[in-house]
Amino acid sequence: MFVETQEEVPEIREPLRRVGITNLRTVAKINWKGREYTFLPLIEVTIDVPAEKKGIHMSRLVESITEAMSEAVEEEVAKVHSSLEELGKSVIERLEGKHPHKRAEVWIKTHLIIPRTTPASKKTSYEPYDVEVGVIKNEDGSFEKVLRVRVIGNTACPHAMANNNGKTHIQRAIGELEIRAPFEEEIPLEEMIDVVESSFSHPTYTLLKTVDENAVVQGMFANPKFVEDVAREIFAKAKERFRGRIHVRVISNESIHKHDVIAETWS
């Protein structure tokens, strides 16, 4: 018989808000609107620990994740998990019967690959986007979610263009959009990505033929923007399309400076 040291009373009786496992790599399949996505996400699962309890049962957290993932990849029940947030909620629900808690969080980090069409040659280019989904069970039993996307684009500087007869410097820009909302609110990650990507001077592509390169450069010079412009546009579009608390962060990797530029706002 094993000694359950986790159930002992700790020397310092302080409650902990988040205790669990992080950087757990696994596999998951999601059926979203008839299209199946396969992910290799990094998972983080945490629960609260009361002051009178020394620790948590780590194996039970992993077991809950494994069970939820196994259910998701079985063909006959794949449709049960229609989104990453549904998968996260399933992990929490399975955890409830294994590890008592008042509050729990599941965070899922992964990449979403979306096919895009190049601007001139009209070829298909598969573009990667960093996404993160958080599912939070509050102490009152309610659920909320946090959705984050990270998109790479570019900007052309309007100040240099206005002072150099149309010549300017260009740089890669990174736009991040976060939305915190009630769990029931439907917010597709793809739409969040579209909001960010359409706010740059021009989108970037993995595959570009010469005619596409020309189209991208011409598009950038026809649409010069400061990093502040990009942040404001993302924020305005997000407020128009989504309900929830919005956080926008844009970083411009400056090409003529040794520093970068940041613009950030939130609701």
Curated annotation (Swiss-Prot):
Pfam family, one: GCHY-1
Record site feature (May be catalytically important), residues: C157
Catalytic activity, reaction form: GTP + H2O = 7,8-dihydroneopterin 2',3'-cyclic phosphate + formate + diphosphate + H(+)
Biological process annotations from GO: tetrahydromethanopterin biosynthetic process
Cofactor binding mode and count: Binds 1 Fe(2+) ion per subunit.
E.C. no: 3.5.4.39
The keyword Cell wall biogenesis/degradation belongs to this UniProt entry's keyword annotation: no
Cofactor: Fe(2+)
MF-aspect GO terms: GTP cyclohydrolase activity; GTP cyclohydrolase I activity; GTP cyclohydrolase IV activity; iron ion binding
Alphabetized UniProt keyword annotations: Hydrolase, Iron, Metal-binding
Pathway of action: Cofactor biosynthesis; 5,6,7,8-tetrahydromethanopterin biosynthesis
Protein transport is among the record's keywords: no
Self-association and partners: Homodimer.
Known role: Converts GTP to 7,8-dihydro-D-neopterin 2',3'-cyclic phosphate, the first intermediate in the biosynthesis of coenzyme methanopterin.
Record protein name field: GTP cyclohydrolase MptA
Organism: Thermococcus kodakarensis (strain ATCC BAA-918 / JCM 12380 / KOD1)
